[in-house]
């Protein structure tokens, strides 16, 4: 606004005979009321109460209106009023205060002549705010309920060092974590927390595999330093050391029973050991590359080994000789599992395929499944028909064996998965990744999973990406299903609360 507009000369028709004392008194009342109102707003941060002017201010404004506006010539909102000009010239520092009072007056005028309208609007506004607060509270309560929901699996374990292998104790709630610096960490796990029991320094170089003996009293570890160690879990004392167990770095261990265990190294040598002897009781070199996994069935007559050179090699434990070696595959054979009552062997490969063999006939596969189309490095049998496979993509997927079917995602890691194991009762799956973390997945729900029929229709694309109950992610279909369920519940509630129709 220009200066000449602020200080223009009042017109004769705008002049009002008001004494200076009345003007000063009126301004003082407004200033005091605005100060009180500002203090109230600053102290309580309650903007809802500021919609209507306080009662003392209403009385002051009403008195001023009766005394000054009785002749009808005085309008506080008129910019051309000489009183406004005089007020601005008399007390410029209080312009903000007068402006605040004018806004409060305008709010009062908009509310109507009666204060009841203002109070009704306050009530409506408060009710609206309460409705919004109720919705917010429901959302917050839902989030809190999800956070406080009882855990079905232990929390994550995070280490500073790379985790090379994990193994569950056969009887107790203890898990062993082998690390790249040669240590083994023993954790007691529960759904509430994980507790570090002890750290055992076993090897000078990377500890590549860790296994518990059948009674759970000792740990068997192998290392890049070519040694095998047997350590008492409770006392941490070394019970036996095979300092040069292999000529090359040892990669895999397998406990056969209370007396025997097997080891395989990076050059393909497989050895059989007896806890009671100093040297190996059997050694065979039929593989030219790293032994990736070893397995046996309940009868423990045959020892099977997969290798990075694409062979499945079977040894006769009793006869201590080669049983059969498969035809070579143009891909790495990384992992395997036994299913269907020890009648089927399934092998996972670096190309994401799954080869199925009839037990005892390991020369060539009888079935080939497309798998997950990404390298499969780990496999854990969950039931007689269901396997969990994992690899470089960081996902743990469940597969149904014979007929083959992708069931969905069991769990996820942010980086490639390095090792997996399942506890004795088959309900808890653990996995470690290149992110130095161990995560747990409750897979008990597979016990109630029915058999799949060969001709059953399914969507392979959706099945592969479907998130199972143990997954940390949810399915979009579940989200929209919940929304539809909420809408149906709301409609039912509306129908229940609706009164009888008044139409005739």
Swiss-Prot record:
Ion transport found in the keyword field: no
Q: Which superkingdom heads the taxonomic lineage of this protein's source?
A: Eukaryota
Q: Which SMART domains match?
A: WD40
Q: Answer yes or no on keyword Nucleus.
A: no
Look up and give the organism this protein is from.
Drosophila willistoni
Give me the stretches of Acidic residues compositional bias.
32-49, 77-95
- From the UniProt entry, list the residue stretches annotated as the region Disordered: 32-135, 484-504
Biased composition (Polar residues) is annotated at 66-76, 114-124
Q: Where are the WD repeats?
A: 158-197, 202-241, 245-283, 286-325, 328-367, 412-451
Protein name, entry field: WD repeat-containing protein 55 homolog
Keywords for this protein: Repeat, WD repeat
Q: Which family does it belong to?
A: Belongs to the WD repeat WDR55 family.
């Amino acid at each position: 606004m220009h200066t000449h507009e602020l200080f223009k000369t009042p017109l004769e028709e705008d002049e009002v005979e008001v004494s200076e004392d009345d003007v000063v008194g009126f301004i003082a009342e407004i200033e005091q009321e605005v100060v009180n109102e500002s203090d109230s707003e600053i102290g309580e941060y309650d903007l809802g109460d500021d919609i209507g002017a306080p009662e003392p201010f209403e009385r002051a404004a009403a008195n001023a209106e009766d005394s000054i506006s009785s002749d009808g010539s005085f309008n506080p909102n008129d910019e051309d009023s000489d009183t406004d000009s005089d007020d601005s010239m008399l007390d410029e520092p209080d312009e903000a205060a007068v402006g605040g009072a004018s806004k409060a007056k305008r709010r009062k005028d908009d509310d109507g002549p009666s204060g009841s309208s203002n109070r009704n609007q306050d009530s409506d506004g408060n009710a609206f705010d309460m409705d919004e607060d109720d919705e917010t509270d429901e959302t917050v309560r839902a989030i809190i309920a999800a956070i406080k929901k009882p855990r079905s699996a232990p929390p994550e374990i995070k280490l500073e060092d790379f985790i090379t292998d994990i193994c569950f104790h056969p009887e107790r709630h203890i898990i062993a974590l082998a690390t790249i610096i040669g240590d083994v960490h023993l954790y007691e796990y529960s759904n509430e927390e994980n507790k570090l029991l002890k750290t055992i320094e076993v090897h000078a170089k990377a500890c590549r595999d860790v296994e518990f003996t059948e009674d759970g009293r000792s740990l068997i570890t192998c290392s890049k330093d070519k040694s095998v160690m047997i350590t008492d879990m409770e006392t941490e004392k070394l019970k036996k050391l095979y300092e040069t167990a292999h000529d090359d770095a040892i990669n895999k261990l397998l406990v056969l029973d209370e007396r025997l265990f097997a080891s395989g190294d990076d050059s393909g040598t497989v050895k059989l050991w007896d806890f009671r002897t100093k040297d190996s009781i059997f050694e065979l070199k039929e593989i030219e590359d790293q032994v990736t996994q070893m397995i046996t069935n309940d009868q423990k007559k045959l020892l099977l080994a997969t290798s990075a050179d694409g062979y499945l090699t079977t040894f006769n434990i009793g006869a201590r000789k080669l049983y059969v070696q498969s035809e070579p595959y143009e891909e790495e054979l990384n992992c395997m599992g036994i299913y269907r009552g020890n009648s089927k062997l399934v092998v996972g490969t670096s190309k994401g395929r799954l080869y199925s063999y009839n037990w005892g006939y390991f020369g060539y596969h009888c079935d080939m499944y497309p798998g997950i189309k990404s390298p499969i490095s780990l496999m854990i049998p969950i039931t007689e028909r269901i396997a969990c496979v994992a690899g470089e993509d960081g996902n743990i997927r469940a597969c149904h064996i014979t007929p083959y079917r992708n069931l969905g995602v069991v769990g996820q890691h942010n980086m490639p998965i390095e090792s997996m194991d399942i506890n004795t009762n088959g309900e808890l799956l653990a996995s470690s990744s290149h992110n130095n973390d161990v995560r747990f997945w409750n897979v008990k729900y597979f016990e109630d999973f029915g058999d799949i029929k060969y001709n059953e229709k399914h969507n392979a694309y959706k099945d592969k990406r479907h998130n199972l109950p143990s997954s940390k992610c949810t399915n979009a279909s579940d989200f929209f299903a919940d929304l539809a369920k909420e809408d149906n519940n709301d409609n039912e509630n509306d129908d229940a609360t609706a009164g009888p129709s008044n139409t005739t």
